[in-house]
Every structure is written in C-alpha cells, then in structure tokens.
Swiss-Prot record:
Component of the PYK10 complex, at least composed of PYK10/BGLU23, BGLU21, BGLU22, JAL22, JAL23, PBP1/JAL30, PBP2/JAL31, JAL32, JAL33, JAL34, JAL35, GLL22 and GLL23. This is Jacalin-related lectin 35. The gene is JAL35. Belongs to the jacalin lectin family. The modification N-acetylalanine is found at A2. PANTHER family: JACALIN-RELATED LECTIN 3, JACALIN-RELATED LECTIN 35.
Amino acid sequence: MAKKLEAQGGRGGEEWDDGGAYENVKKVYVGQGDSGVVYVKFDYEKDGKIVSHEHGKQTLLGTEEFVVDPEDYITSVKIYYEKLFGSPIEIVTALIFKTFKGKTSQPFGLTSGEEAELGGGKIVGFHGSSSDLIHSVGVYIIPSTTPLTPPVSGGLTKLEAQGGRGGDVWDDGGAYDNVKKVYVGQGDSGVVYVKFDYEKDGKIVSLEHGKQTLLGTEEFEIDPEDYITYVKVYYEKLFGSPIEIVTALIFKTFKGKTSQPFGLTSGEEAELGGGKIVGFHGTSSDLIHSLGAYIIPSSTPLTPSSNTIPAQGGDGGVAWDDGVHDSVKKIYVGQGDSCVTYFKADYEKASKPVLGSDHGKKTLLGAEEFVLGPDEYVTAVSGYYDKIFSVDAPAIVSLKFKTNKRTSIPYGLEGGTEFVLEKKDHKIVGFYGQAGEYLYKLGVNVAPIAK
C-alpha cells in the first residue's frame, strides 16, 4: 500500500488527490504564471494504460514537460514555495523532479522561498491544493526494489547511458582495473569528444569517441590510489533538432576530487555512480549524445584503520576522503535551514599549503571559517547529527572544534545524537565522510602528537 506524504507549500485553494493506486508516473507537465507555478498535469500508468490528472489553470505561457524514461521512475520532488506579495497565502514557485536512475528535471519556475523535498521510494501519485495557482504538492510513495541494472558479471554493473538517442553506440566494456585519465573536447554546441585512459594489468589502454575540434581537449587526471565514483551528465536538444547532445560532464572521485564542469551545465541533468567506475559506454557522431558507465563495488578502506576514528552521522551522499596531512590549517563550515550542508578543510604537508576539496553544497548563508594559528592543531571534533524532515538519512546538524589552545563556537544548532571524534595524545591530520546536498557523516584521520 502506498504511503501518503504530507503536501508541502501553502494552505490556500482547494485540495485535490490523484491517489496512489498507479504503477508509475510517466510524464509531468508544469505551467508557470507571473508569480509561480499555476498548473500541473500528471500522466500515470495503470494496467498498461495512461491516466491523466490536471490541476490549476494554464496560462498563455503553456507548459513544460518532464518525461520519465522506460524502466525508470520518480524518486523525489523538490518544492519551493513562498507568500505572494501582500498576501498571507503561499504558492509553489518551482518544482524539480529526480528519478531513480539519476535523471533530474530543470527547475520548473524560480527557486525562491522555502524549500522542501518529498521522496524516499518510488512516487506513484500526487496530491495537493490549488486555485488558479498551485499552493501545495504532496506525494504517494511505495518502497523501491528495482535494481539499477542486472549485474554483468563478478559484481560488475552496467548503468544505462544518459542523454540523447542519436549517433552510433560504442562500448569500452568494464574489464579494466581503473580509469586513470579523462579527456573532454568541446565544440560550439556541447561536448564533441571524449577519451579515456584505462588501466589493465599495469598497462594503459586508451579509447576515444566523437570528433575533436580546433578547441582541443581538457583533462581530468585521477590521483594514485583514487578512482572515479560518479559522473554528472548534462544534456539537451540542439536548436531546431529533436536530438539531444551532452552539454557538460563533471567527474568526482572517491577521495573527493571534483573536476571542473567540462562544458555548459544547461538542460537536463543525470548522475551515474554508486561504486568504482571502471568503464564507459554511450553514443556519438561528431558529437557525444549520451554517456553510461560500468561500476564495481567499492571495497577500498578510507584510510588505515589504526589511524582512523570511525565516521559519525547518517549513511547518505557520496564518500569522500581528504587523506592524511601534517596538520589542519583552516576549516570552513556552511549551514542550511536545518543542518550542515558544506565542509572544507585546508591542510599543510611538508611545510606547503594544501587546499582542500569542497564537500556538500553551500547555501546562500555561505560558510564560516575557523583559522588555526602557528603551532596550533586540532585535537578533537564534537557535534550532533539528527534526522531532518524529508531527508532519508540523518545529517550533521552541528560541529565544534577543539585545539591545543582553544575551542571553537558551535557551527549549527546543538541537538540530536551527540558524538566526539578524538584519540588521546593524537592530533587530527585529515577528514573524511559522506556528503551530497548535506554533510551526512564526518570522520577523522589522526597522527601522534610529537613530544
């Protein structure tokens, strides 16, 4: 039986309820007006037939659409809402939909005001309230039991290519040990060329696809003992053409290294990940139309256990590890409405500064900084983690840092489950954890304090 999640937004208008007795949502239509979202329509699948329900009122601006691919389904919807100027009634200002396979819609509307997210399973129905505007949206969900794709062999999984259906199919396979280097070439309209250096039995195997232009290529090199864990793919249709192309690619590794965006981050957005990426496949012509990946389970320990304090928090987001350095020099903490959303640390190694990687996502509140002085080092981190409304996993809600000379202010609101990361006669020389939209988990790497 489907679970009904409370509608998020305002209390204006009349309630509507499509129910949760459908098998899937196949297509979403969203219409906008001067002030926000004024119209929604959902195409549901039931016994092989399409059942459509619409709410609100269309304007001359028409509607925009989000089509759910075969064998995929919506897992979350992000809802933005705020009060109309001079009115006590909130309306929905924007909607963003995300699917099980990582496909994300464009923002339908302006992402302003309050923000809420509904999900935690397969969405099979919607409810809410509306007048000539959409005031609120809620969902019906059922548990998600669908595997990404059947395992190919030995734990290898082939993730479906994301993007358009143009060009010829290519497949590098997933029989490699690692991806060592990525080359991306851009053209006038998007990504036109990719090349991957794979490692196999200590040798490099290079495979290329698409066609280079005079603009050449940009590169993303993977550090030793690191590997790519996910790729973000942006794609959209060429002007005047029904065929989508990849407009940008972003790569991220197990240890938190993130590439620059190779291209313009416009159009639809999808993510490929969930393990160690060991191969790619896709489609191309003189352009790159789609990109998929082969993954295997990640079994690499974050750091040697004898010098690691286990991470505390919830099991969400993507794993990252800054590694081991000589000392921590600066810490950045960014907060959102309910929890810590961003974390970064700068280090020193061999008397040289090491700029850290960003983990999580900054909000409009920015980030606060904790700067360490000469001969100062971090000896402990304390904090709290808690379950946040509409977020599947518990997230870090507060952090506080203790050094050999002082203790920082608490960054965030103290409440929930308390934790302390500390080892006697040791100092913290690196951080690791898990992050996505929020900072879900934090652990530390430590080293003995020199006497």
